[in-house]
Regions:
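Short internal beta-strands
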Residues: 1-4
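Catalytic core of the metallo-beta-lactamase
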Residues: 7-75, 96-107
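Cap/insert and terminal regions of metallo-dependent hydrolase folds
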Residues: 62-141
């Protein structure tokens, strides 16, 4: 929808924060407070820690059968097809701080279920570490 010529997002029914009660008793949120729009990870305290990620953590080593030819070209150029990656589109458009992104390494987790890409089962924190500690193009200070 548009408001005064500017595109706006739909408004949520409920705004969540890190203290919000979630429907799973062992779930909590980690918010990236510097990104616009906000981004969050859902952390499940089981099986060594499971992170459910939106746009921030991705694991797409190669295109899937569901990507069109044009999507494959565009996404490859943007840096999407990499294993254990911090979402390049998210970094470029949401502009989180590098410290906020790197704070993921303070979490206890073994697995990542990304909304973009394949599940990372076992050793996920160590697998994402190089991307989280490396250059984060699009972050602000």
């Amino acid at each position: 929808p548009e408001k005064g010529g500017a595109v706006t997002y739909m408004e949520p029914d409920v705004w969540l924060n890190e203290q919000s009660a979630l429907p799973l008793p062992d779930a909590r949120l980690k918010l990236f407070t510097s990104s616009k729009p906000p981004e969050a990870l859902c952390i499940l305290a089981r099986e060594g820690g499971i992170v459910i990620a939106g746009d921030s953590l991705q694991h797409s080593p190669e295109p899937s059968e569901f990507h069109s030819f044009l999507a494959k070209l565009m996404m490859k150029r943007m840096g999407f097809f990499k294993p254990y990656n911090v979402g390049p589109g998210w970094l470029q458009f949401a502009h989180p701080t590098a410290d906020d992104v790197r704070s993921v390494l303070e979490l206890d987790f073994e697995h990542v279920l990304p909304c973009h890409g394949d599940a990372v089962i076992g050793g996920a924190k160590d697998k994402f570490r190089p991307a989280l500690e490396g250059e984060l193009k699009g972050c602000h200070t």
